[in-house]
Amino acid sequence: MKINCLFCCMSHRRFNRRSSSRQSIKDCIDAKNNITTFDNISFKTDSSRRRYISEEIAKLGKGNISAHIFTFRELCVATKNFNPDNQLGEGGFGRVYKGQIETPEQVVAVKQLDRNGYQGNREFLVEVMMLSLLHHQNLVNLVGYCADGDQRILVYEYMQNGSLEDHLLELARNKKKPLDWDTRMKVAAGAARGLEYLHETADPPVIYRDFKASNILLDEEFNPKLSDFGLAKVGPTGGETHVSTRVMGTYGYCAPEYALTGQLTVKSDVYSFGVVFLEMITGRRVIDTTKPTEEQNLVTWASPLFKDRRKFTLMADPLLEGKYPIKGLYQALAVAAMCLQEEAATRPMMSDVVTALEYLAVTKTEEDGQTVEGEEEEEEDERSKL
């Protein structure tokens, strides 16, 4: 499937996103000797882990870490002793609570990492460093952290609408209404801008490595922000084409070349974006064992449908109830298909994806003046004239 024509049509909308002075992590950190070697960080004893993690963050950040250091007592007060009534979510990393802090006075989300979970000291360090040094409207803001004793706690800005997963894949459990088409395109465009910033503005580039619906948080106006940077990795530098690392991330979202070889590039994130975008279009989970065998893997199910434009409407989320522009659906599926190309080199850059999605995001459904059925009839009339 070709998407080049879509990008050409919208070339007049493309912005010069690559700043002449890329935001440099290297200005704050010796990238060669520090941030690229997070995998080699080790703490010789349990006491050194507990005692010196804040000093390690300060040393690596070279005084550029602005995040507030909270005491465990302060966060107990903020969350009312981590009261279950204040719990916002739970995952393999631990639990997230709503809290109220006094300095600065604001409502926050407090993520208490599970001491036996997958996110250990290394991932904790990476997340604090990344969110302290990288700033963008589509990245969640880190307010502070706590490393008292064996506690590992991250304090974020509070996002009123939770995660994209809550509104897309967990509707019944969370008693949410399905997102309309325009909101889905708005969220997709914003999340794409976050990845574009990491790939094309941060210096050196950052590979997110864990792009999924549960890591996309939404504010009260459904503006998206990427969260959970524990698995983020600094991208290749100095002429290198990829970073070799052990495979991490969530099953179903990993690019095939990364899953098979451990070779990681920014195009690995592009694939993951394609998976999530396809989830947003279809309302289906990437892996759903409740469906028939041939439909359990979202990408496998979608692949043959991508080749037949007449079947595109079969891929739209039934909860949209046909309320979407048919041309917008075709273009959105074209973007998803390009992001999901098997060969990494054939996937678009995130700046191209942003260009396409910003066009879709400003093309409001109600402005089209046609129902889906009306557009289909128009297309049928055009075909009959040929």
From Swiss-Prot:
Q: Which GO terms describe its biological process?
A: defense response
Q: Might you give the EC number(s) for this enzyme?
A: 2.7.11.1
Which keywords has UniProt assigned to this entry? Answer: ATP-binding, Cell membrane, Kinase, Lipoprotein, Membrane, Nucleotide-binding, Palmitate, Plant defense, Serine/threonine-protein kinase, Transferase
PROSITE patterns on file: PROTEIN_KINASE_ATP, PROTEIN_KINASE_DOM, PROTEIN_KINASE_ST
UniProt keyword S-adenosyl-L-methionine present: no
Cited InterPro entries: Kinase-like_dom_sf, Prot_kinase_dom, Protein_kinase_ATP_BS, Ser/Thr_kinase_AS
Q: Per UniProt, where does ATP bind?
A: 88-96, 111
Q: Which reactions fall under this protein's catalytic activity?
A: L-seryl-[protein] + ATP = O-phospho-L-seryl-[protein] + ADP + H(+); L-threonyl-[protein] + ATP = O-phospho-L-threonyl-[protein] + ADP + H(+)
Annotated protein name in UniProt = Probable serine/threonine-protein kinase PBL23
